[in-house]
Each structure stands twice: as structure tokens, then as C-alpha cells.
Amino acid sequence: MNRKSRILKMLTKTGLVVLAIVFCYPVLFLLTGSFMGQSELSENLGSVMGEATRYARWNFLPQNPTLKHYIEVLLDSPEYFVMFWNSIKVVMGTLVGQCTIAIPAAWGFAVYKFKFKKSLFFLYIIIMMMPFQVTMLSNYLILKQLKLLDTLASLIFPGIFSTFPVFIMFNFFRGIPPAVIEAARIDGAREWDIFLKIGIPLGKGGIIASLVLEFLEYWNLIEQPMTFLNDKTKWPLSLFLPAIRGENVGFAFAVSVITLIPAALVFFAGHEYLEQGIASLGVKE
């Protein structure tokens, strides 16, 4: 490796470290703020909270660490746990439904040939690219006709038929060598057995990657529950933080940290499969 290459490699690593610090800063900000007392937060963020005119400042080591905000969230906020279990129900219901619908759909697109296959898959891609604001009205009217508004099913039902997990899993299933499938057919394996014993084991990377991504998406729903739910007892955890009053900064920090933990655990548990899923997103026909 010549001198120019070493310098370029060093600059690249330095740039990546700087980016990592920038992206980690909000997490460190939340974590340290959650252990600060209200007086210290007011002193540091007085200008942001409208209590002072000087510039805001921040200390990464709390002067007087306290667990007060965590105790308040975990022991004095029953509505937090109601919303937490609402989020669990929504996420688990959506993921189970997606496994039931998306895995066979992705396998069908990847393995079988049928009329209008490319056109139908192209339609899937178009729907996947549409933001929620485009489909919001149609979803609302359908859910109203089905009498699902103001229920957790109004969040679960549209998510079950999401096209995104189909797209992720399709790219993994498509990577299975056709010779393997043909050999199984020659040996007398039924199509269902091929799907269960070859497709799912070899495509588990795509399945797990899509489940991780969908967990992160539905754990952080904002617009859908605000649109489809009027009963606040049905709200998911993602709407708890916006409902906190501005002066309860420490409480908001603690809520943010606790809410972040499940998402972080899921991400780190499936990050290897997630990397494989992102690498497989190139569409080939």
C-alpha cells in the first residue's frame, strides 16, 4: 500500500469516526439529560425552555445525577404502560400478519412464473414508494366501512398488507439457485415442502431483515395513530412523548431513553441480517 492510499484510508476512517460521533450525539444528549435534575436542566437549557436569554449549554456529566425522572415514568405514570402494551400489540400483530402474507407472496414472485408477474411486481414497487399521506384518505374510508376506526386493528390491518417486506424477502428468495429447487422437485418434494424446508431456511436473512425494519417502523408510528385513533387509551407509545408538557424536560428525556431500549435491542440483535437485506435491494430481472 503506497503512501497516498494510506493517507486516503486514514482520512476515510477519520471521517467515519466524526460521522459516528455526530449520529451518536443525540443519544448521549438524551441519556445524560435523563439523569439531570430539573434545576440543572433549566440552567443548561434555559434559553430553549424560554426561561433565559443566554445561549444554551450542555454538560455530558450531570453535576448531581438522579433517578427521579425514571422513577416518575415507571412508578407514577400508569398511562405509560397502557401505551407501551398498545405498541406491543400493534407491533406483534403486524409482524405476525406480515409473516403470514408477505413470506408466501415474496416466494411466489421469486420462484414461480405467471401472467402479468412483472406488471404486478412493478405495482408493488409503486405502492411501496407512496408515502402515508397519499394513501391516508383511502385507508381511512376503508377502515371506516370495516368499522375498525378507533381500534388497534386500524393500525395493524394496513400494516399486514405492506408491500415493503415482500420486496425485501423477494430479493433473498430470488438468490436461491433454481437448480436446488428443481432438484427437490425431481426428488418428489411437494411445492409446500420446498417452501418450508428450502425457501424459509435459505431466505431467513431476508425474513429477519424485514421484521427488524418493520418493527422499527411500527414502534415509532406517529401519523397513523393520530389519524385513525381518537381514544387516547388506544394510543401507542410513540404518541406519549408528544403529549408531555414542555416544562417536563427531564421526564421527556427519561421516556425517550426507555422507549429507545426495545428498538435498540431489536436493531442490535438483527443488524447482521439487516446489512444483508440492505445489500440485496438491487432489483434484477
Pin down the residues of each PLM region.
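A structural signal for multi-pass alpha-helical bundles of membrane permease subunits
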Residues: 2-285
